[in-house]
Amino acid sequence: YPIKPENPGEDAPADELAKYYSALRHYINLITRQRY
């Protein structure tokens, strides 16, 4: 199973948050693809 991305926290810089959210979206896509 893929590793869940680490949440950078509320006070993280915007680019860190953007990187986290794209990684999280990719992670969710991987999991949902495996399930179906």
UniProtKB/Swiss-Prot annotation:
This is Neuropeptide Y. It holds the Pfam family Hormone_3. The gene is npy. CDD domains: PAH. One of its GO terms (biological process) is feeding behavior. The modification Tyrosine amide is found at Y36. It is found in: Secreted. The keyword Secreted applies. NPY is implicated in the control of feeding and in secretion of gonadotrophin-release hormone. SMART domains: PAH. The keyword Ligase does not apply. Belongs to the NPY family. Keywords: Amidation, Neuropeptide, Secreted.
